[in-house]
């Protein structure tokens, strides 16, 4: 199993460059938005939300990558693997390290651009950029792409395209109702443990379904 994990990590290592655009694209979006707010002299308190928005975008992009890896690479590599657990663990670790790398790059870029912005707009303190993000949110965001990938790939394996479409419409519904659940989470960040716990339980089911996936 250890050999399979190491082999999988080495095989996927060339794809680590994908963490760069996954991190920098949201940072650029946030930077443009911040400059527009500064130029129009709107309420600087709006800047408090921007890093959170950028982090969400980065995590969403990493979730997409996690789904792609577990839905496409897992069935492909399963044909050459004697250890399903090792293969699944290797892909999950690869997704995790890519997400952590993207978060680090995004955090460094945001701080660097925040320092530059502070030079031009002194009333926007750099420290305010991180006031709205609790510390425990970062590790939660790091594991989200792994959990989402396991759920999505597991549902596709167990229920086929029908299950995938159901998840897709549930995701769309969640995005359109963001105004109803984002404010409670922003006011009480600890409540994030409930949806994450439910997602983790579904991810366990997804992993079990992947363990029973047929070799194509």
Which residues does each predicted region cover?
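Hydrophobic alpha-helical transmembrane segments of membrane proteins
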Residues: 1-75, 85-216
């Amino acid at each position: 199993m250890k050999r399979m994990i190491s082999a999988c990590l080495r095989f996927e290592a060339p794809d680590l460059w994908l963490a760069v655009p996954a991190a920098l694209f949201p940072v650029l979006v946030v930077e443009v938005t911040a400059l527009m707010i500064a130029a129009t002299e709107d309420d600087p308190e709006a800047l408090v939300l921007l890093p959170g928005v950028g982090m969400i975008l980065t995590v969403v992009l990493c979730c997409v990558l996690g789904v792609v890896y577990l839905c496409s690479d897992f069935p492909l590599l399963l044909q050459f693997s004697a250890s399903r657990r090792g293969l699944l663990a290797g892909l999950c670790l690869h997704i995790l390290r890519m997400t952590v790398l993207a978060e680090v790059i995004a955090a460094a870029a945001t701080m660097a651009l925040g320092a530059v912005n502070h030079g031009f707009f002194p009333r926007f303190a750099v420290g305010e950029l991180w006031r709205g993000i609790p510390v425990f949110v970062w590790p939660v965001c790091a594991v989200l792409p792994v959990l989402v990938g396991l759920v999505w790939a597991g549902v596709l394996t167990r229920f086929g395209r029908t299950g995938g479409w159901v998840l897709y419409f549930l995701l769309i519904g969640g995005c359109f109702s963001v105004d109803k659940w984002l404010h409670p989470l922003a006011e009480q960040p600890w409540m994030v443990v409930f949806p994450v716990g439910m997602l983790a339980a579904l991810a366990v089911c997804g992993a079990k379904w992947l363990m029973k996936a047929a070799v194509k």
